Design a protein with these regions (language model features):
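C-terminal membrane-cytosol helix-exit motif in multi-pass small-molecule transporters
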Residues: 118-122, 126, 134-156
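Short hydrophobic/small-residue motifs within alpha-helical transmembrane segments
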Residues: 24-26, 111-112
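Helix-to-loop junctions at the C-terminal end of transmembrane segments
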Residues: 31-44
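Cytoplasmic helix-loop-helix junction between adjacent transmembrane helices
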Residues: 74-108
Length: 170
């Protein structure tokens, strides 16, 4: 939906739109990889706040800077923030007492958000789209404090090796 808006409202070419979208995804990938290295030593809450700050800042700047080169950089930064944010969420799934149930809830939330996004974004201006992205991060701010700041101890740390059952291969 946003790809069409970049073409229609900002007059980007199809090639430029693909590069901007790829820049966003590259940022997401790099942010997730960086989080995988930092999550053991940094606070999960701080990583989440960093991701939110990067995404809000980049999306806010996208409202004011609409040229291709700047948008390309800002979408990378927004993706980087999304990578931090998403990687902490996925790590939280693994640390949950019921990871399968938590993953199912995350998939449901993702499906609902995608549905709402596809219904709403085609009716928004370019600035409205960026404000929508900002709002999705802002509404999650009160919940960041619920994220454990550090990694919870794993069962393998608490259980002697000889008493652990082998994992099931499925």
């Amino acid at each position: 939906a946003i790809n069409g808006a970049w073409v229609d409202q900002l007059s980007f070419t199809e090639v430029e739109v693909n590069r901007v979208a790829s820049s966003d995804l590259l940022g997401l990938f790099i942010g997730a990889v960086l989080t995988s290295f930092a999550i053991g030593s940094w606070s999960r809450q701080n990583l989440t706040y960093l991701g939110i700050a990067l995404s809000i800042t980049a999306n806010g700047l996208c409202i004011h800077y609409v040229d291709y080169e700047t948008t390309l950089i800002l979408r990378f930064v927004a993706g980087l923030g999304a990578g931090f944010y998403t990687a902490v969420a996925v790590a939280g799934l693994g640390a949950h007492s019921k990871p399968r149930e938590a993953f199912n809830w995350m998939l449901l939330a993702f499906a609902i958000s995608q549905f709402l996004e596809l219904q709403l974004i085609p009716h928004l201006s370019m600035n409205g789209i960026y404000l929508f992205f900002i709002a999705t991060y802002v509404v999650t701010l009160p919940f960041v404090r619920l994220i454990p700041a550090t990694n919870p101890p794993s069962a393998t740390q608490d259980t002697p090796t000889e008493s652990r059952r082998p994992t099931l291969l499925a």
